[in-house]
Each structure stands twice: as C-alpha cells, then as structure tokens.
Amino acid sequence: GSASDRPYPNHGSPFRWAIEDGCIDPKRSIQVGMRGMMSSEHDYDFANEHGLKHILAVDMHHMGIKKTADIIRETVGNNPVMVTFDIDFVDPMFAPGTGTPVPGGFTSFETLELIRLALTGLNTVGFDLVEVAPNYDPSEITELLASRIVHEFIALLACKKAGITEYAYRGKE
C-alpha cells in the first residue's frame, strides 16, 4: 500500500515495505538473528504469508552457526545478494554501541564465522552495516568489531574475484 496506508513503522518496516513494493523477492531472502520485542506478531505473520524465511536468535543458538549458514546459502542460491548487517545481531557484551542492545545475541567469533561460512562465494552485489552508535560505547569495542566485519566483507569480495568460493576452515573438525 501507499505510505499513508502503512502502520506505524518499526525496525522491520523498511524490509516489509520493500517486499510490498516488489523490490525484494521474499522467497529468496532471509533474516537471521532477530530477538527481543521489536517485531510484532503481524510482522511474523506477514513473513510467513509471503514465504520469507527468518531464523530467530534462539533457534540459531540451538542449531548452530554452520547449520544457519547452510540455510542462508540454500535460500539465496546464486542470485544477487544485498547484505544488510545490523550490529545489534551481536550480543551487547561484545557490541554495546547500538541504539537497541538486546541480550541473547552472538559473540564476535560467532558473528565473523557466520559471515565467512554463509557468504563466501555468494553473488554479493552490496553490503551495509547499520545501527553502530559510537556514543554508546566509550570502550570502542563496537567500532573494532564493526571495522572487522567490513574488512571480512571486503575480503570475501576479493576472494570471489579470485575464484575462491568456499571458506577454508583451518581448524580441526
């Protein structure tokens, strides 16, 4: 509908409106790591009605980063991918500099590992990092992690250009 017909906006509104306006194919899109009270039941109903996959943080914690990464890769396939990374995906213990800190997020390691496992080799056409609020973090650990996240995305683009399409895990399984 038109902007005047839309309900009061919340954090998920731009994504929903992009689907309503035909800018995003919900069947090839996925949202991961949501937690807290920022989304309404209507938002989840809308997502389910339109085939938009979403994985709540609690489900990610239970299934693990690798399984979550596999679902992301399966969902987007070889299609062009625009990645929006919201820093409040990360637990405020590791990234307190955000306007909406909610406990129960992910560690710095889990965050970087998800980025590497899920996005290596994808047809990424754009990336943005949102919700970093330096004034809420005098320790600057949020900015340190945010800069590392941007570094990882740039490295993934370079790897893709070099023909590297799989994340080379160097540890023991």
What do these predicted regions represent?
Residues 1, 37-39, 134-136:
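Active-site environment of divalent metal-dependent phosphoester hydrolases
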Residues 1-28, 121:
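Active-site histidine-anchored catalytic micro-motif
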Residues 5, 43, 95:
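Short aromatic-enriched loop/helix-cap "lid" or pocket-rim segments at secondary-structure transitions
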Residues 6-10, 35, 82, 142:
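Short, contiguous, pocket-lining structural segments
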Residues 10-16, 33-39, 61-67, 107:
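A general structural motif
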Residues 37-49:
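Short, glycine/polar-rich helix-capping loops at beta-to-alpha or helix-loop-helix junctions
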Residues 46-173:
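Catalytic cores of soluble, metal-dependent hydrolases
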